[in-house]
Structures are given as structure tokens and as C-alpha cells.
């Protein structure tokens, strides 16, 4: 098995995960990107089949006029994030004239009077498909789909548009283009030269310069680390497989180059490949692998081709589900192709090829939690749908769909309770009730069905995949040897499990009832030994963050085994809620459950009457009491307004001090405001578990209503607040130079504000202890764990910074017992304080959670390394002396920007070893250039921004501008890359005035006029040009918070 594992997964990981930044992309829901070597082929065939072609038609050979097209990729719009190109002739040669996939392809296009010679190539550009060839006719194409349409001329092309589906088929010269109407138009504009091509992107130019242009298949994409491309060539009896990765960061390129080179050498030694070559040019890594065609394909292509060919055929002919006859013929045709030997009593056989799956045996689970809060929750959820635990054998979550083994709930009853109308469609022998919800514009249609004793519901594509699995197709256990091995090795008798089909590891967690304990046993099979160590670290951190202590984790080569033990009572009242969440059961508790018996109805009525009487008594009590005692004036005002043509709301905090629940966020993602007013703390939610809110609708617009707020009255005036990074309470600085740790009880008393419109939840102090005598004006939660078992709170005043340090385990034990154990009265664990003094007042200080503290002062930036150090070993390891008027730091990536009064600069934080082999962190000096601009009042920087790149928001008085950070490697006179003293490639940084999305709905807002000067800026973009949204959250220099954006 291990040899097979090496050949199928290790090399795949090297070329298609390590080099392409371990990101995955799906072309269709049922096709996973390059899970084995031949998946790239099946993706390409999916693209071939995704564009049906007509029976006849004239091939119009036109000369190129507006734009010179030298490569097929020249017709792909610059906005495309995922591109798959397949050259038909080479594709047939690669798989073989008589392979199952090619025969299926011939059969399909033969139905339309075409042969493989009639199609030159196909391209998928995101969700748009382009076919170039002979005999392509848009009318017959649309007729085959059975859709009504209107005809429209667009930029020289003939378009047939179905407005119900916003779908179009267009013929332009010898191209047939179909997909989303706006996207089809964009492809036409690109061919005409009216819209930029993807080949105009610098990164794509760099990538294509590293490969020959006679590739058979090309797969190009992008993620947060850069761009990647996979290219396949036929070389006689061999196959050349090239992968090119263009990284944003040269450090990533260096690391992956060394790692992949070592792995390729191992593959060569093992005889799995014939030859290889790997090269790095600055931030670009190129790996070329030569192997025999037989080794590359093996027998996987034919086996997968049988399934993918059939599914693609079905999806092509029935994509819009309008021809019942064709559906019936498909269902009848595939009845004979179902695996008759599948054992549907085994839940594993119901799992399609998905990224995760969970299972709960309701009978066994009920015995575990009977009489506990978790059982009551399960019972109340099921009751909303007319079910009890006795009516359900088991339930499963299968990534984008859920399955419940029951004959007591029908799809029609389910949709009736939810209030959705539906249309009937047919798939794989099942009748689907297809419906849309308020989120369908973003995620697509939903479906529910009853099939072979199972109630299945979720996203339509997910439901179809589950039906395929039941029918013996698309089965995770059959297709993934590691999952099979995990299932076979884990003991039977579990009452629940969760399986993970990930790209660095496959894993499983199984729940067992063992006396007064619940034991969760896990097994992970990782890509290699190094990833196993990383997996152990991830699991260990998860356990610690959830407060678990009784666990064991062992690593043996590429395998990780885990055992977690939880008290059964604790599981029944707390941990077990996970298994009845919507992530597991899929059903949500309805506001008004219809299936409640008469006795329960009477009880509810009595309780409601009692509540009314209590409310009346409370109101009377308030009327009789002194109004000054029970009425408060809120510390903020608000109003609706329009900002830059967008719907918005403004909150004005007056002269009150405001901080944000942002200890774990960068300044670009500041969250709920905390308002400090003397001895009063007003907030809209805090980590101790209590929650209020200022209301704005994330989906449809902004609403200037505050209807619930939390008030905490302290026995002293408050100067600063920060989270305790554990969820027990807050650290609070009083005005007498004392640092407190404060734990609150859940608010049990609610009064109305002075206007009578806003509920004020009064939170009471449960425990308030003085932690240290340290006089600071600002607090920030620092390192959660510096990996030497220390937590760090950051405080500062003027030019002095204080790191208040406590042992992690001792603090968390104390905090947990103080919050949940009545009568617990042990003193706060000892703290150590280290003071730093800087030349210039401190503007801001924060941590990356573990490794270092970054300090921004008026006169420069400083790095304090704390990783794996004792408190007395914390020290300043680097400084950058410069004028700082404002700055922004992204805690997750270590990227930062700063403004010196005339220019915005970009850099990041890097690591190196000292002479004693200890790691230190420093500010990178390998970035040149910047943004010349005057009047900057605020900055934000977000890496991993929508997984597309690095984006900077720059704000001034009256404006906000959006820039996308792009890099150009610095070259010497001979064209060689230039490096700094630490061996890092030097880059010229460019601030491109645009959003990271290449889409007009977003680029439209890259520069906006606003009625304020921004200090902290958050910008969020969602969707696409058809269903997209821009959202801003801006805290201003004059103590106001603006929320504004466009509607979907």
C-alpha cells in the first residue's frame, strides 16, 4: 500500500500542492482538482463535454481584425481566476483513440454530427465555456437545451439569451461561447480587444515565459500565495508534466524549491519518474517531470472515464433540467450501470467523494446524552419537523448536503415547514424538489428528496452527489485508499464519526461510549512525515484552545493517532452540542414548531401569560422607582445616510473613548466597538459569552437601529480594556494605575434607555482581581502562547511599553475555575513585567499571537522577539528608524504598511537565526518603491484578501483609495535577480490603483469620496459582477464609525 501511496499522492503533492500553494479548486462540484494524476485529464474532459455542439453549421474562417491572437489564452478575460485549456487532438493522443473517455466523447459529439476533428480546442474561463472549431451553431445548441431565448447582437457576435437563467449562447467567428450572460459578453470583448486578456497580467506572462506553447492541457489558477499553472505535453512515448508557481513572496519560493527538489530526487531513485528538472528564478519555481505515458496514466483514466464520461454527458445534455424526456432516458440508461453490490446498510457507502463527512447513530447517541441538555436540544430540533429520536436511525452531513435515515419526513413536508415553493426535477432515479432561498444568488439552487429510505437535502449539486453515491457511483471509500484504511483500522462500536478528505492528510475521528467517559479516537494518514508533525501541532492547538487536557497524540512516520477523553456528563451538557449543530444534522430549530402536543401548548401559554404579568410588574416597578436610578443616556447616536452613493449608517461616539474587540484581528478587521465612559463600559458583545449588537443587515443593506446594548458598571473609572485571549473575561486598567482581570456573569436584568427604545442588558461583576500595578493608557491582548507556556498582555503609555506575562496553563486553570466553579477563591497566578522605553511616543503595539511584538512609535518601527523565550529574554531584535504618521499591520501574514508624511511604504516581518541558533524576527529591507501621496490619515492592509492577493486601503480627509500590491523582481544590468544581505530577492513594490478583483463592480469603488477622514478601514467584497457587493467599515479620526456598502 505504501508504494501505491507514494506514487499516487506524494508526487502529486510535490507538483500540484506544494508548488501550487496547497490550494484546491473545483471545476464542477463532482470533480476535484488533480486528486490523482489523471484528475487533470478528467477536468479537461469535463470542459470538453461542458460545451455541447450542434449537428450542423458553417465554419466561418475570419481574419483577425481588432486583436492579434497568438495564443488560445489571449481570448481569456483578465478577470478570470481559473482557466482550463484542452487541445482536442493532443488530448485524444494522450488518452488513446480507444480509451473509455475518448469513446464517450466521440459518442456524445457524434450525436450532433461531429467528430473529434471538428473541435480544435476548448477553454473554461471560470464559469464560461469556449469552443473553437467547425460546425458550431448557436441556434441548435440552445434548441438542444430546450430553452426559450431572445436574440441580440453584441459587439459583432450573435447572442441567444435566456433571461430566466441569465444564460447565453453566442457565436462569434469560429468560437461558440456559453455561460453567464455578462461573462459571455466579456469573452467576446476580450476576443475583440475591448477587454484585457489574462495574458496581459505580469504573473501570467512570467509563467508562460517558462513553458513551451505546445501543451496539450493547461490549468491556470490563483490563490493567496500567487499564481500557478500545470501544463502537460506529449513527448513521444513519454509525458512531460510542468508546474510553474509564481509566488508573491520569494521566501515561499525558496522553501518550496528545496523541498520539492528533494522529493523529486526520491521519486527518481524509486523509479517512479524517468527524469526531472527544477529551477528557481527569484519568486518563480518551475518543475519539469518526465515519465512514461503508461506510468502517467496507468489504468486510472479508463476507470474514472467510465464515471466522469457518463456524468458529464448527463450534465451537458440536462444542465438546465428542462427536457423531461431526456432525463427519463438518462435515468433508464443508467439504471443498468449502478453497482448492484453496494451495501446501503453500511453508512460509509453513502458518502460521495467530498472533503468531509459526519455520521451520528441516533439510538446510540441518545443513550449517551439522555437526560442531558444535548438530548433536549436534539429532541426539540426533531420535534419541529414532526420527528422524535426514535424516528431517526442516523443522520449524516456530506459537505454540501445532509442525509437522514427516516421514513417519517418527506421532502414536501420539509419545504412546507420552511415556506419554500419548488419545482420538480429528476436525477438518478430520484424526484428532486428544487427551490431557491435568499442565498441562492451566491451559492446556487437547493433541493430535497426522498430516495431509497433516505431524506436528502442541501445544495442541489450536493444532493445529486449523494444520489450518485447511493447508486454506486462517486464513492469516497471506493476512491480513496487512505479513507478505506482508516475505516478498517478504527474499532467498531462508535456512535459517531467524522471523516476528512483533505489535501495534506486524510483523517477520521470516531466517538465511543466507555462507561462514564466519551473517548474520541482519531487516525490521520498524511502526505509525508513532515506533514504528520504539522498535523500533530494543529490538533494539539485545537485541544488546548478548547480547554481539553486528557488527550494523547502520537506520530509514527506519516500517521498521527489521537485519543481524547471527555467526561460523559460534560459531553452531555456541553461538548455534545456539536453533534446536533446544523453542521452535523442539517436541520435548524424553527421559530414556530407546529408539532407540539396540546399539553405543551398549554404549558407554553401559561409561561407566556406569566411572562406578560412579570413584564407588567417590572414596568410598574420602574414607574415607581427613582428615574435617575434606572434610566441611562446612551453613549452614542446614529443616523442613516448615503456615503459615496452607497447605503450607510453612521455611529457617533462623541467624546467617549472607543476601542474594539480586535485583539485577534488586524486593524483592517476591527470588530464591535467598546465604549468607555468613566466607570461605565458599553459594548455590543464580549468574549465572556454575552452578546448584544448594533444592527446592520449583512445581506441587504444597513439599518441604523441600535436595539440592544450591554452595560457594565465598574467600581472605578476605566482607562483601557482588552480581551483575556481565553474567553473568561477582560483585562481592565483603572485610573489608579492598577491592572485588573474581571469576569462577568451573564446579564439577567434588562432595562430601557432614556428614550424607551433600546434595551440595556446589565452585566454584573462575578470576580474582579488586581493583577499588577502598572500605569498604562492602552491595552492590547498580545501573545496567546509564545510556545514557552506564556501569555502576554501589552500595555503602553507615552513612550513606555510593558509586557505583562503569565504562565498560560496556570492562568487558564485559574480563569476556568473562577468563571465556572462557585466558591473558587485562589489568587491570580504570578505575573512578570518587562518594560521597554522608546524614542518617541507609541502609536500602536500588537502581536502576531505567538512570535513577536511589533511596536509603532512616532520615530520608527520595532520588533520584540518573544518566541520560545522566558520573560527576561524578551528583547528588541530590530528597528526601522523613520517618521511614522500612521501604519497598519496584518497579524495573520506579518505584512505591514506605514506612512511617513509623504509616502506609503510596504514591508513584512521575517525570521532568521542568531549565532546561538535561536530565532529572531526582523523587518524586511528587500522592498523598494512606494506610493507618493499626501494627506494620509489611515491605512489598512489585508493579505489572503478573498484569497486573491494583498490589498491596501489608504484614507485621507474626504477620500478612500484601494490599491493592489504587485511586485517586480529587481534585476541587475545582466538581467539577474538582486538580493539583499539576508539572501532575499529585492522587489520593486507597485501600488496599483484597483481592487484585487478584476471586476467592474469592485474596481468602480477603488477610489471614492467620503465625508470624513478614515483611521481604521475595512473593505469587504463578495460575489461577482452579477451578484456582488462592496462593503466598507471605517472608524474615523473624529470618533465616528461608518458602515456603508452596495446591496446585492
Curated annotation (Swiss-Prot):
Region Disordered, residue ranges: 601-629
Bias type Low complexity, positions: 605-621
Protein's recorded name: Uncharacterized protein MJ1281
Amino acid at each position: 500500500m505504501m508504494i501505491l501511496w507514494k506514487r499516487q499522492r506524494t508526487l502529486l503533492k510535490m507538483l500540484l500542492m506544494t508548488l501550487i500553494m496547497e490550494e484546491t479548486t473545483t471545476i464542477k462540484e463532482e470533480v476535484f482538482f488533480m486528486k490523482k494524476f489523471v484528475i487533470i485529464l478528467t477536468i479537461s474532459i469535463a470542459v470538453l463535454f461542458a460545451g455541447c455542439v450542434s449537428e450542423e453549421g458553417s465554419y466561418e474562417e475570419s481574419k483577425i481584425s481588432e486583436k492579434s491572437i497568438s495564443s488560445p489564452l489571449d481570448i481569456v478575460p483578465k478577470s478570470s481566476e481559473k482557466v482550463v485549456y484542452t487541445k482536442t487532438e493532443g488530448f485524444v493522443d494522450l488518452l488513446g483513440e480507444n480509451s473509455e473517455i475518448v469513446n464517450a466523447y466521440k459518442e456524445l459529439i457524434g450525436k450532433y454530427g461531429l467528430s473529434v476533428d471538428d473541435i480544435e480546442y476548448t477553454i473554461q474561463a471560470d464559469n464560461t465555456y469556449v469552443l473553437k472549431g467547425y460546425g458550431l451553431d448557436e441556434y441548435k445548441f440552445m434548441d438542444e437545451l430546450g430553452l426559450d431565448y431572445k436574440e441580440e447582437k453584441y459587439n459583432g457576435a450573435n447572442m441567444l439569451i435566456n433571461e430566466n437563467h441569465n444564460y447565453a449562447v453566442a457565436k462569434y467567428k469560429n468560437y461558440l461561447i456559453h455561460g453567464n450572460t455578462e461573462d459571455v459578453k466579456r469573452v467576446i470583448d476580450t476576443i475583440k480587444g475591448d477587454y484585457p486578456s489574462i495574458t496581459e497580467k505580469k504573473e501570467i506572462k512570467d509563467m508562460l515565459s517558462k513553458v513551451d506553447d505546445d501543451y496539450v492541457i493547461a490549468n491556470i489558477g490563483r490563490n493567496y500565495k500567487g499564481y500557478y499553472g500545470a501544463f502537460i505535453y506529449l513527448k513521444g512515448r513519454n509525458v512531460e508534466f510542468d508546474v510553474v508557481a509564481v509566488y508573491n513572496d520569494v521566501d515561499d519560493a525558496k522553501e518550496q524549491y528545496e523541498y520539492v527538489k528533494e522529493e523529486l530526487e526520491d521519486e527518481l531513485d524509486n523509479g517512479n519518474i524517468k527524469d526531472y528538472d527544477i529551477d528557481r528564478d527569484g519568486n518563480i519555481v518551475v518543475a519539469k517531470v518526465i515519465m512514461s505515458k503508461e506510468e502517467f496514466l496507468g489504468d486510472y483514466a479508463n476507470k474514472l472515464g467510465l464515471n466522469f464520461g457518463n456524468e458529464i454527458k448527463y450534465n451537458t445534455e440536462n444542465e438546465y433540467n428542462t427536457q423531461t424526456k431526456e432525463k427519463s432516458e438518462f435515468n433508464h440508461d443508467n439504471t443498468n450501470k449502478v453497482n448492484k453490490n453496494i451495501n446501503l446498510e453500511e453508512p460509509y457507502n453513502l458518502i460521495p467523494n467530498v472533503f468531509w463527512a459526519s455520521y451520528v447513530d441516533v439510538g446510540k447517541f441518545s443513550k449517551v446524552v439522555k437526560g442531558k441538555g444535548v438530548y433536549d436540544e436534539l429532541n426539540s430540533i426533531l420535534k419541529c419537523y414532526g420527528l422524535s429520536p426514535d424516528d431517526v436511525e442516523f443522520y449524516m452531513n456530506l459537505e454540501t448536503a445532509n442525509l437522514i435515515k427516516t421514513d417519517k419526513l418527506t421532502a414536501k413536508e420539509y419545504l412546507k415547514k420552511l415556506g419554500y415553493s419548488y419545482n420538480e426535477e429528476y436525477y438518478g432515479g430520484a424526484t428532486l424538489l428544487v427551490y431557491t432561498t435568499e442565498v441562492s444568488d451566491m451559492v446556487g439552487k437547493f433541493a430535497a428528496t426522498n430516495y431509497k429510505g433516505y431524506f436528502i437535502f442541501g445544495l442541489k449539486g450536493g444532493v445529486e452527489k449523494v444520489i450518485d453515491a447511493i447508486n454506486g457511483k462517486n464513492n469516497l471509500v471506493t476512491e480513496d485508499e487512505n479513507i478505506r484504511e482508516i475505516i478498517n483500522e478504527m474499532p467498531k462500536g462508535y456512535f459517531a464519526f467524522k471523516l476528512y478528505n483533505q489535501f495534506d492528510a486524510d483523517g477520521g475521528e470516531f466517538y465511543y461510549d466507555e462507561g462514564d467517559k466519551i473517548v474520541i479516537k482519531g487516525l490521520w494518514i498524511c502526505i509525508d512525515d513532515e506533514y504528520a508533525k504539522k498535523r500533530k501541532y494543529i490538533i494539539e492547538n485545537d485541544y488546548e484552545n478548547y480547554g481539553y487536557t486528557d488527550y494523547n497524540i502520537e506520530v509514527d512516520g506519516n500517521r498521527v493517532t489521537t485519543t481524547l477523553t471527555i467526561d460523559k456528563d460534560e459531553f452531555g451538557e456541553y461538548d455534545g452540542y456539536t453533534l446536533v449543530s446544523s453542521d452535523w444534522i442539517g436541520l435548524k430549530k424553527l421559530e414556530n414548531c407546529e408539532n407540539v402536543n396540546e399539553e405543551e401548548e398549554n404549558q407554553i401559554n401559561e409561561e407566556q401569560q406569566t411572562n406578560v404579568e412579570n413584564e407588567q410588574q417590572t414596568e410598574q416597578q420602574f414607574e415607581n422607582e427613582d428615574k435617575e436610578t434606572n434610566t441611562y443616556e446612551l453613549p452614542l447616536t446614529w443616523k442613516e445616510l448615503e456615503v459615496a452613493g452607497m447605503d450607510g449608517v453612521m455611529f457617533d461616539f462623541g467624546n467617549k473613548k472607543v476601542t474594539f474587540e480586535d485583539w485577534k484581528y488586524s486593524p483592517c478587521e476591527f470588530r464591535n466597538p467598546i465604549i468607555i465612559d468613566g466607570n461605565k463600559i458599553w459594548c455590543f458583545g464580549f468574549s465572556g459569552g454575552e452578546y448584544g449588537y448594533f444592527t446592520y443587515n449583512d445581506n441587504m443593506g444597513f439599518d441604523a437601529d441600535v436595539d440592544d446594548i450591554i452595560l457594565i458598571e465598574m467600581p472605578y473609572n476605566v482607562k483601557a480594556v482588552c480581551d483575556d485571549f481565553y474567553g473568561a473575561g477582560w483585562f481592565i486598567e483603572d485610573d489608579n494605575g492598577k491592572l485588573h482581570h474581571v469576569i462577568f456573569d451573564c446579564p439577567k436584568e434588562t432595562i430601557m434607555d432614556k428614550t424607551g427604545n433600546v434595551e440595556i442588558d446589565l452585566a454584573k461583576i462575578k470576580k474582579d482581581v488586581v493583577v499588577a500595578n502598572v500605569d498604562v493608557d492602552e491595552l492590547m491582548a498580545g501573545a496567546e502562547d509564545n510556545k514557552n507556556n506564556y501569555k502576554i498582555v501589552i500595555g503602553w503609555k507615552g513612550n513606555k511599553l510593558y509586557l505583562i506575562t503569565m504562565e498560560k496553563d496556570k492562568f487558564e486553570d485559574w480563569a476556568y475555575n473562577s468563571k465556572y466553579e462557585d466558591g473558587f477563591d485562589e489568587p491570580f497566578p504570578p505575573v512578570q513585567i518587562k518594560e521597554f522605553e522608546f524614542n518617541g511616543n507609541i502609536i500602536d503595539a500588537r502581536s502576531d499571537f505567538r512570535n513577536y511584538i511589533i511596536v509603532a512609535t512616532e520615530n520608527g518601527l520595532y520588533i520584540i522577539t518573544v518566541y520560545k523565550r522566558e520573560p527576561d529574554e524578551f528583547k528588541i531584535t530590530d528597528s526601522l528608524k523613520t517618521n511614522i504618521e500612521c501604519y497598519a499591520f496584518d497579524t495573520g501574514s506579518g505584512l505591514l504598511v506605514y506612512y511617513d508624511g509623504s509616502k506609503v511604504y510596504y514591508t513584512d516581518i521575517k525570521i532568521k537565526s542568531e549565532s546561538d541558533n535561536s530565532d529572531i524576527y526582523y523587518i524586511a529591507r528587500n522592498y523598494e518603491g512606494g506610493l507618493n501621496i499626501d494627506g494620509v490619515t489611515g491605512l489598512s492592509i489585508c493579505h489572503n484578501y478573498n484569497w486573491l492577493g494583498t490589498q491596501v486601503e489608504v484614507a485621507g480627509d474626504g477620500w478612500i483609495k484601494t490599491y493592489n500590491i504587485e511586485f517586480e523582481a529587481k534585476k541587475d544590468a545582466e538581467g539577474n535577480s538582486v538580493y539583499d544581505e539576508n539572501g532575499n530577492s529585492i522587489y520593486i513594490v507597485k501600488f496599483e490603483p484597483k481592487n484585487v478583483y478584476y471586476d467592474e463592480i469592485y474596481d468602480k469603488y477603488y477610489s471614492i469620496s467620503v465625508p470624513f477622514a478614515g483611521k481604521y478601514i475595512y473593505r469587504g467584497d463578495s460575489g461577482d459582477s452579477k451578484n456582488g457587493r462592496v462593503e466598507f467599515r471605517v472608524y474615523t479620526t473624529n470618533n465616528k464609525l461608518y458602515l456603508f456598502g452596495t446591496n446585492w
